[in-house]
Amino acid sequence: PPFRGENMKEQLQLKNHLKEVRTEANLSQAQLAEMVGVSRNTISSIETGQFNPTAKLALILCIALDKKFEELFYF
C-alpha cells in the first residue's frame, strides 16, 4: 500500500523549486522574503526543505513569483 504509518509522513514531504525560480527571477532570499512578509531565514529554510510553508505562504510565494502551485511545489 502506498501510504502507511511513518512512511506516509515521509512520502508527503513537500518539495520545491523555490531556489531555482527565485534565482531565475533575479531575486535574493532577502528580496523575496520582504516581498512575501517573512524572514530571509524562512525562505532559506523552505529552499533547503527544513521548513514546509503553510498553505497561505505557499500561495503568496506563487503569486509573488507568478507561478502555479505545481510549478513551485511537488511531492
Positions of PLM-derived features:
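Short alpha-helical elements of helix-turn-helix
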Residues: 16, 40, 55-59
